[in-house]
Swiss-Prot record:
Name of the protein in question: tRNA uridine 5-carboxymethylaminomethyl modification enzyme MnmG
Pfam families membership: GIDA, GIDA_C_1st, SAM_GIDA_C
GO molecular function list: flavin adenine dinucleotide binding
Biological-process GO terms, alphabetical: tRNA methylation; tRNA wobble uridine modification
Length: 629
C-alpha cells in the first residue's frame, strides 16, 4: 500500500549523513521523511567516540556555518576538547573532541524530533520506486510505499555488509544490526558502477581491568575549545582524560605468528581498507622497522566502563585479540567486552554523481556518506548536508548548489570524489586543499554562512550572531587603523617593550599587529590601543586577517585566475568523439568522467593542458563556450 502522505524528500538511513541530510531538507521547509531501520540508533557512533581532527574539524565547522547539527551535538556531548597543531599556523589548526556516545546520540535525536517539517519512520528500505529514470519513492520491508520528489541514500556500511572476525564471517550492517541485502541487489540493477570497500574497528576494553596508574594521561586543553560558532564551553559535560600505551615486540610477534588467521591476509576480504586508519595487522607489516605504535585509550562516556583503544583496529580471531591487548603496558589483565571486527560493504562510484551529489543517471536520487567511498563521521555528515539541501532544491525545481574548492573543504571533498573517484576509503586532510590559507576552521562562517542564509539553511539567531561578528571585526579593524603611535609619543615605551626593535617611524594599530612578535592581546594591553574586543571570535579574526593579509591577497589572485576555468561549463551529454584533435586516451577519460566544467576536466589524471586548449577552441567554434555565474 502507499502511505497516504507524499513527501518532498525521503532520506534512507539515520547515521551521520542521513541525520544532516534530513535536517537540511527540513530546515529549507521541505516535507521530509527519514526512514531508518532503528530509531534508537539515530546518530550512532559506530566506531571511534570522537569528532574532528586534521581536515575533519574543518568540515565540522563548515557544517555548523551552514546551520548543520554536528558541531552543536558534540558541544553537548564532548568529554575532552583539544586543538591539534596549536603551535602551527591557523590554516592547519584543528579542533578534536572525545564524545560520550550516549549524550551524542541523545543530542542528535532531540534535534531531529524537534525539527519542523521532519517525520521519522522505523522500517528498513528494500526497494526504490524508479519511473523513466527518475526516482519517485521507496518501498519498506513490510511493503509500505512512500512517494517523494527526491530520495537521498545514506546507508553507510549496510549494503550487503559482511562482518569478519578471524576466518569466520556473517552478514551484518555493523555489530548488532542486520545488513541491507534487498536494497543492495536493487541498486546493482541500476546503471551504476559498484565495488566493495572494507573498514574495521578495535575491540572494546573494560576500564576496570586496566591499570591506569602506569600509563601517561592526556588531558584536554584549557581554556576548553568550542566547536559551534553558536556554542560556549558551558554547554560541555564533565571532562575526562585519555591515556596512552604502546604496542611492543611481543605484540608484533603475536600478530606476525597469526597472519594466516587474518581474513585480510588469507584473501577472504576483497574490499580495500582505509589507508590512513589501517588495522594493527597492516601497521605491523607495512612498518616492519617500527618496534612500537602509540595507542590512545579513549573513554566511551561518563557513565560507561568501555574504553576504545584507538590504533588496534583488527579482524584477527578473538583469542589473538586477547593476546594483542594483554601484551601492552597497563593491559596485562584487560578484559575485552566487544570484539574487534572488519566489515565489507558495497559502495558506488562517486564519479557517477554530479557535484550536487545527484546521480547522473537517475534523476532525483542523491548519494551521501560511505556509499560514496568515504570514511569518517565528518565526511559523511558534510556530504549529507549537501545532498539534503540539494534534494530539497530539486524537489522545489531549484538549481543545485555545491561549494567550489576555494570556498570549502566540502567543495574539495565533493570535487575529489566526483572528478577522481576513489579506490579506497577517502579521508579528508588539509593537504588535499590547494587554498588552505583561505579554508581555515576559524573563518568557516565568514565563507559559508551568508550562502547558507540564502539557501534557507541558517536561522535568524545564527544570522544575527554572524552579522554582529562581521560588524565587530570591521569596527575593530577600523579602530586600530585610526590609532597612531609616534616614536616620540609619551607612552611609546609600552609598545617598544613588546617589539624586537624600538619604533622608528609612526605606525598605526594594524601595522603594529602585523609584526610577528606582536599579538592582539599584547597590543590591546597597551593603554593607547585598549580595550580589547569582548567578542573573542571577532578578535581572533582581526589578528589573523591583519597578520596574513598579504598571503591571503596572493592566494585570492590565484583563485580568480583558476575561476575562469571552473566557470566554463561542459555539457553533460557531450560526446568527446566529436572533438577533433583529442587523443583516444583523453576521449575515453572525458567520456568516462563526464566533467561538469573545464576546471574539473583539468583535474582528471591524464588530461593535459594541450587537451584543455583543444577543448576550449572546439567549444568556441561550436558556440558552446559559456560560463556559469
Amino acid at each position: 500500500m502507499f502511505y497516504p502522505e507524499q513527501f518532498d524528500v525521503i532520506i534512507i538511513g539515520g547515521g551521520h549523513a542521513g541525520t544532516e541530510a534530513a535536517m537540511a531538507a527540513a530546515r529549507m521547509g521541505r516535507q521530509t521523511l527519514l526512514l531508518t531501520h532503528n530509531i534508537d540508533t539515530l546518530g550512532q557512533m559506530s566506531c571511534n567516540p570522537a569528532i574532528g581532527g586534521i581536515g575533519k574539524g574543518h568540515l565540522v565547522k563548515e557544517i555548523d556555518a551552514l546551520g548543520g547539527l554536528m558541531a552543536t551535538a558534540i558541544d553537548h556531548a564532548g568529554i575532552q576538547f583539544r586543538i591539534l597543531n596549536a603551535s602551527k599556523g591557523p590554516a592547519v589548526r584543528a579542533t578534536r573532541a572525545q564524545a560520550d556516545r550516549v549524550l551524542y546520540r541523545q543530542a542528535v535525536r532531540t534535534a531531529l524530533e524537534n525539527q519542523p517539517n521532519l517525520m521519522i519512520f522505523q522500517q528498513p528500505v528494500e526497494d526504490l520506486i524508479v519511473e523513466n529514470d527518475r526516482v519517485v519513492g521507496a518501498v519498506t520491508q513490510m511493503g509500505l510505499k512512500f512517494r517523494a520528489k527526491a530520495v537521498v541514500l545514506t546507508v553507510g556500511t549496510f549494503l550487503d555488509g559482511k562482518i569478519h572476525i578471524g576466518l569466520e564471517n556473517y552478514s551484518g550492517g555493523r555489530a548488532g544490526d542486520p545488513p541491507s541485502i534487498s536494497l543492495s541487489q536493487r541498486l546493482r540493477e541500476l546503471p551504476l558502477r559498484v565495488n566493495r570497500l572494507k573498514t574495521g574497528t578495535p575491540p572494546r576494553i573494560d576500564a576496570r581491568s586496566i591499570d591506569f596508574s602506569v600509563l601517561a594521561p592526556q588531558h584536554g586543553d584549557t581554556p576548553i575549545p568550542v566547536f559551534s560558532f553558536m556554542g560556549n564551553a558551558g554547554q560541555h559535560p564533565e571532562q575526562m582524560a585519555c591515556y596512552i600505551t604502546y604496542t611492543n615486540e611481543k605484540t608484533h610477534d603475536v600478530i606476525r605468528n597469526n597472519l594466516d588467521r587474518s581474513p585480510m591476509y588469507a584473501g577472504i576480504i576483497e574490499g580495500i581498507g582505509p589507508r590512513y586508519c589501517p588495522s594493527i595487522e597492516d601497521k605491523v607489516m607495512r612498518f616492519a622497522d617500527r618496534n612500537a605504535h602509540q595507542i590512545f585509550l579513549e573513554p566511551e562516556g561518563l557513565t560507561s566502563n568501555e574504553i576504545y583503544p584507538n590504533g588496534i583496529s583488527t579482524s584477527l580471531p578473538f583469542d589473538v585479540q586477547m593476546q594483542i591487548v594483554r601484551s601492552m603496558e597497563g593491559m596485562q589483565n584487560a578484559r575485552i567486552i566487544r570484539p574487534g571486527y572488519a566489515i565489507e560493504y558495497d559502495f558506488f562510484d562517486p564519479r557517477d554523481l554530479k557535484p550536487t551529489l545527484e546521480s547522473k543517471f537517475i534523476q532525483g536520487l542523491f548519494f551521501a556518506g560511505q556509499i560514496n567511498g568515504t570514511t569518517g563521521y565528518e565526511e559523511a555528515a558534510a556530504q549529507g548536508l549537501l545532498a539534503g539541501l540539494n534534494a530539497g532544491r530539486y524537489a522545489n525545481e531549484d538549481e543545485g548548489w555545491s561549494p567550489r574548492r576555494d570556498q570549502a573543504y566540502l567543495g574539495v571533498l565533493v570535487d575529489d570524489l566526483s572528478t577522481l573517484g576513489t579506490k579506497e576509503p577517502y579521508r579528508m586532510f588539509t593537504s588535499r586543499a590547494e587554498y588552505r590559507l583561505m579554508l581555515r576552521e576559524d573563518n568557516a562562517d565568514l565563507r559559508l554562512t551568508e550562502k547558507g542564509r540564502e539557501l534557507g539553511l541558517v536561522d535568524d539567531a545564527r544570522w544575527a550572531r554572524f552579522s554582529e561578528k562581521l560588524e565587530h571585526i570591521e569596527q575593530e579593524r577600523q579602530r586600530l587603523r585610526d590609532i597612531w603611535m609616534h616614536p616620540h609619543a609619551e607612552n611609546v615605551e609600552q609598545v617598544n617593550a613588546l617589539l624586537k626593535a624600538p619604533l622608528s617611524r609612526e605606525a598605526n594599530g594594524e601595522e603594529l599587529l602585523r609584526r610577528p612578535e606582536m599579538d592582539y592581546t599584547q597590543l590591546t594591553s597597551v593603554a593607547a590601543f585598549a580595550p580589547p574586543l569582548a567578542d573573542t571570535q571577532a578578535a581572533e579574526q582581526v589578528e589573523i586577517q591583519v597578520k596574513y593579509e598579504g598571503y591571503i591577497a596572493r592566494q585570492q589572485e590565484e583563485i580568480e585566475k583558476q575561476q575562469r576555468n571552473e566557470n566554463t561549463v561542459l555539457p553533460l551529454d557531450l560526446d568527446y568523439q566529436q572533438v577533433s584533435g583529442l587523443s583516444n586516451e583523453v576521449i575515453a577519460k572525458l567520456n568516462d568522467h563526464k566533467p561538469n566544467s573545464i576546471g574539473q576536466a583539468s583535474r582528471i589524471s591524464g588530461i593535459t593542458p594541450a587537451a584543455i586548449s583543444i577543448l576550449l577552441i572546439w567549444l568556441k567554434k561550436q558556440g558552446l563556450l559559456r560560463r556559469s555565474a
